[in-house]
Amino acid sequence: MHSNTAVIALSALAALVPAALAGGNLGTANVQNACGKDVYLWSIADSAGEKMITLKDGETHSEQYRANSNGGGISIKMATNPDHKDISQFEYTVSEPQVFYDLSNIDGYPFAEGGVSIHPSDSSCPAVVCEGGVKECKEAYNQPKDDHATHGCPQETDLNVVLCAGGGSAGPKKMFKPVQEKAANRPRHPHARPE
């Protein structure tokens, strides 16, 4: 009897998360391809069954922030091959009134040659800059406990990711210096397992 009540309560709570997100002013996640060749994206909520997006050079994929059904974050998996292997992940989680974001290279870093950057539309929020030619970006997750790589901004802030931001066949892009953020204000990685 108690388990049925708990299941009903959790189901109702899970249904409220997307509704709560719809009620506020939410920003947009944008991923721009500056690599000079096609790149492949998968915007993942609950499962890896989402459709592959082929992003041609110069194109941008945009999506308004959303949540998965358990209230967790979204992972936009980014690759240079359509086989869903060797991926970088742009991850965001809306937790009113903020959006938390990071770049994860735990499952590969196919953009090491050209680099990756994340520039929030709110200039007071920290940028993430992984310069081209660097095999391990210190501003990204390279190990599961690299929590220094998670940043937060107001939830209405757009997050602009540029793939091959530091080069590629499309040439170098303007690089921005990231704003330093106090370590005490950083949350744990939004997709991390509990300790």
Curated annotation (Swiss-Prot):
Gene Ontology cellular component list: extracellular region
Membrane spanning residue stretches: none
Keywords linked to the UniProt accession: Disulfide bond, Secreted, Signal
Oxidoreductase is among the record's keywords: no
Cystine residue pairs: C125-C153, C130-C137
Role this protein plays: Might be involved in the inhibition of growth of fungal competitors and pathogenicity.
Keyword Disulfide bond: yes
Database matches in InterPro entries: CetA-like, Osmotin/thaumatin-like_sf
Compartments, record wording: Secreted
Listed name of the protein: Antigenic thaumatin-like protein ARB_01183
Region Disordered, annotated ranges: 171-195
Family annotation (PANTHER family): DOMAIN PROTEIN, PUTATIVE (AFU_ORTHOLOGUE AFUA_5G01990)-RELATED-RELATED, SECRETED THAUMATIN-LIKE PROTEIN CALA
Xref: Pfam families: Bys1
Family to which this protein belongs: Belongs to the thaumatin family.
Leader peptide range in chain numbering: 1-22
Regions of compositional bias (Basic residues) in chain numbering: 185-195
